[in-house]
Amino acid sequence: MSKTKKIIIAIVSILLCALIVIAVICKSNQNVQKIIKDDFGSSMSVILDNPSDFGLSDIDASSDIEILNEININNLSNDKGNVISIPVVINGNIELIYSISLTACSYNVSVGKDYAPLLNEMKKNGYNEVYIIQDEYTFYAFSDNHIYKQSGQEITQIDEKDLDFTIQDDMKKSDLISVNDDYTQASIESLKTANNE
């Protein structure tokens, strides 16, 4: 084997190893629990400082905050994206959605009302396992033949005949009552850190 081929093989081997290391680092940087611990507190501090700006009342740093499991969004446009949506329960009500947008080796977080009022309406009416369907900027929640629609911040109950789609076999349900203890603990630690800064 010529010296040039050996050098090329060595360079390719080094590059492959570097790519594997980068992929492992990127994967480990996208651990949801770590992201919550690192960023939830600073995101929530803005809301807790000015709750009325976000359409919230009667919440502050002493409020009881719990984090539910991730929501399965069934997107009609088939644009699955790489966004993790996590409901935030404050004093027993689903008030906010904590969203994590994953990119190649990074992430962005946001927290806001989004479709939290729709989830809270379903939970309030006793529908704890629901299909969440997104059609562009409109969200639908289905459970036991009960359908609610959220467009903007307005929520209405609708009939199945008013829909342009049906539940498909590959659509997934979301659980609106299961608290994720690990996420909740990470959020509490993150809030404590943010309040001490």
Model regions: which residues?
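Exposed beta-strand-loop-beta-strand "reactive/processing" segments of non-cytosolic proteins
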Residues: 56-103, 144
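Generic detector of intrinsically disordered, low-complexity, polar/charged segments
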Residues: 7-10, 52, 109
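Gram-positive cell-envelope targeting signals
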Residues: 1-41, 197
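A short, surface-exposed interaction/processing loop segment used at functional sites
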Residues: 95-140, 145-194
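Short, non-transmembrane alpha-helical segments in secretory-pathway proteins
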Residues: 28-76, 113-128
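Extended aliphatic helical segments
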Residues: 12, 21-24, 32-35, 46, ...
